[in-house]
Amino acid sequence: MSLHITEPVQRFIQSHKVARLATADADGQPHVIPFCYAFDGTAVYFIVDEKPKRQTGKPLKRIRNILANPQVAVVIDDYADDWTQLAYVLITGQAAIIEKEEEYERALGLLRERYPQYRVMSLNFPHNAVVRIVPTKVLAWGKVEQ
């Protein structure tokens, strides 16, 4: 059974292009990065793409962390100098690397629809990992519900 996410919260999630992903390693050491994502109403997806990475040759820290500890958090936010306009959505959930090619292709399609840059990248299964985050809790704060 999937978590019910209200229409205003779904619109807020869909209206943003970048979120922050928080992972933790097996020892609980946190790691936060900005990331591009797609949301289908029940899950958040992201891909390890061809953008330059700080490190090459081994799985990225976010992937290593998810494999060691699948509990993650995602924050999507609006900042404004007028603090009455502040808003965020905090999603906590379980992350997993997609292992079925059919789901991978569906998620990749969502990402390519949202980000034209992905349409020209050579992204393929299983070389470019796609991660699915299934929300277990969603918290909205501020001007989200408008």
What residue ranges belong to the model's regions?
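A short, Trp-centered hydrophobic/proline-enriched beta-strand micro-motif
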Residues: 13-25, 71-76
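Short, acidic, Ser/Thr-enriched surface-loop or helix-capping motifs
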Residues: 24-27, 90
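A short mixed-secondary-structure module that forms the rim of ligand-binding clefts
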Residues: 40-79
